[in-house]
Amino acid sequence: MTEIINVTAREILDSRGNPTIEVEVAVGTGDVGRAAVPSGASTGEHEALELRDGDKGRYLGKGVRKAIANVMDEIAPAVVGLDAGDQAVLDQRMIELDGTATKSKLGANAILGVSLAAAKAAAQAHGLPLYRYVGGAGARTLPVPLMNILNGGAHADSNVDIQEFMVVPLGAPSFAEALRYGAEVFHALKAVLKKKGAGTGVGDEGGYAPNLASNEEALALIMKAIEQAGLKAGDDVGLALDCAASEFFEKSSGKYDLEGEGKAFDGKGLVDFYASLAAKYPIVSIEDGCAEDDWATWKLLTERLGSKLQLVGDDLFVTNVTRLSRGIAEGVANSILVKVNQIGSLTETLEAVRMAHRAGYTSVMSHRSGETEDTTIADLSVACDCGQIKTGSASRTDRVAKYNQLLRIEEELGKAARYAGRDAFRALR
């Protein structure tokens, strides 16, 4: 019934105007699944390879015609005839066809597009929403949105070093109300920034991208916005940071250089910096607080703050079970960021989430800075029981599309729906 009968691919544009790949998989029932692959701005060194053309005369070298050719000429002949409902077999066939550790032969973007499109086709053929098809009958937990309302680092042209400042509506009674909390703080922050004379242009993920005196000033302004929105910081809304520390780590000196505020720290100094922020503000989560291969400072950070805060590994783990298993064994971090294109297949993504949950780590489903209207990660956040999702601010359709899909899922679940709230954060339980 769900035998794959056709695979096609095309080049489309993502939210930054760069090409990406979109794949359609058709099955014997006549159902067709479609998936568009996202792309990151700050990418970890250990991520699966996103295959680009490299032709500087076309899309500045960022075209994906090579990946499309690999889908049409290599992957399609190998998967036509397979059952789209047997995700593990399908993904393993593509992984073996590629034969490299980082999917560099065919491209992780090519493999992932087929992987996700096949899952969608199978879900449609079975008459099930994607979250139910992947997650089963127990999939009913709506995630807490970690809403990136102020952008810095690689996501903005500003002097703010920390990449994302997020509001976390952990005290809301439902996802719909959580989204309202976040949107109202987002709008309040615009008024706060305007009053200060700061810019209100937005970055890649829809958050404001002003020039500020320091990273701490960003937190102070968000606290003011929470208050002006009529909400209580710490109870209704917490704060979260994505430091993307690999972006400001100087390998030659071993120092973390916060250029925007003229400070440089060694590992211990950086941990002290985070501890001082956490003592002053209701921060519930810090992502990529240390560089991706600075395991010693990660260990120090976990020992210092791991019992109080969620410490999320993004570039550290890259949704890879090998790196995650090392982190678990060494007691590093306590949460994993889940990005489907970091590893390049749905099966491997699900394996990483299962490993994290077995070890008592939390998981956060995440978008990339280069997104499309595709809403797959919204369904996957519910299917995987992540309890948290990062998909940008309350602006830009590529971000809001995921939130709107979660609103639909919550409505469809009705009284069975459960909003994760504070329970999504191990340290707050």
UniProtKB/Swiss-Prot annotation:
E.C. numbers: 4.2.1.11
GO annotation, cellular component aspect: cell surface; extracellular region; phosphopyruvate hydratase complex
UniProt pathway annotation: Carbohydrate degradation; glycolysis; pyruvate from D-glyceraldehyde 3-phosphate: step 4/5
Entry keyword annotation includes Secreted: yes
One MF term in the entry's GO annotations: magnesium ion binding
Keyword field: Cytoplasm, Glycolysis, Lyase, Magnesium, Metal-binding, Secreted
Keyword Lyase: yes
Catalyzed reactions per annotation: (2R)-2-phosphoglycerate = phosphoenolpyruvate + H2O
Single Gene Ontology BP annotation: glycolytic process
Family that this chain belongs to: Belongs to the enolase family.
Record function comment: Catalyzes the reversible conversion of 2-phosphoglycerate (2-PG) into phosphoenolpyruvate (PEP). It is essential for the degradation of carbohydrates via glycolysis.
Name this protein carries in UniProt: Enolase
Gene source species: Anaeromyxobacter sp. (strain Fw109-5)
